[in-house]
Amino acid sequence: MKPLILVLNGPNLNMLGTREPAQYGHETLADLAQGCADTAHAHGLEIEFRQTNHEGELIDWIHAARGRCAGIVINPGAWTHTSVAIRDALVASELPVIEVHLSNVHKREPFRHLSFVSSIAVGVICGLGSHGYRMALSHFAELLQERAA
């Protein structure tokens, strides 16, 4: 059985391709999901790719990942800067987490510079567009190979 990585996307990411394309690009969420699926397949991983605009739903998905998934790639969107609950759920999952952002949050408004997730993540990738998700999945493949050796 292939290791399962949960790829989570927070609020407004369903609007990719039409929302602020200068900031987030022209790729849609479906394009992003397909790129992640292709990368996962190439590395012998499976993914569950999800997006929600409801914080409690995201937390439920994180809770359900414990003991079932090998890791979590998460773009919490605006919740990055506001949600202690998501941070606590990620800690409770006891899974390695990679935080991803399409835009370089450090080149944007000061309130976007704070992340409640970064301090508990094994890595943070921002500003590389959808390539950041693929990099995160590639890293998980390497991490899992190292653990298996």
UniProtKB/Swiss-Prot annotation:
SUPFAM superfamilies reported in the protein's UniProt record: Type II 3-dehydroquinate dehydratase
Domain of life: Bacteria
One MF term in the entry's GO annotations: 3-dehydroquinate dehydratase activity
Catalytic activity: 3-dehydroquinate = 3-dehydroshikimate + H2O
Keyword Glycosyltransferase: no
This protein's pathway: Metabolic intermediate biosynthesis; chorismate biosynthesis; chorismate from D-erythrose 4-phosphate and phosphoenolpyruvate: step 3/7
Coiled coil segments of this chain: none
Keywords for the protein's UniProt record, in alphabetical order: Amino-acid biosynthesis, Aromatic amino acid biosynthesis, Lyase
EC number(s) per entry: 4.2.1.10
Catalytic residues of the enzyme: 24 (proton acceptor), 101 (proton donor)
UniProt binding sites for substrate: 75, 81, 88, 102-103, 112
One GO term of the biological process aspect: quinate catabolic process
Protein biosynthesis is among the record's keywords: no
Residue(s) at site: Transition state stabilizer: 19
Subunit structure of this chain's protein: Homododecamer.
PANTHER family xrefs: CATABOLIC 3-DEHYDROQUINASE
Functional description taken from the UniProt entry: Catalyzes a trans-dehydration via an enolate intermediate.
Family: Belongs to the type-II 3-dehydroquinase family.
NCBIfam families linked to this entry: aroQ, PRK05395.1-1, PRK05395.1-2, PRK05395.1-3, PRK05395.1-4
Protein name: 3-dehydroquinate dehydratase 2
Highest classification ranks of the organism: Bacteria, Pseudomonadati, Pseudomonadota, Gammaproteobacteria, Pseudomonadales
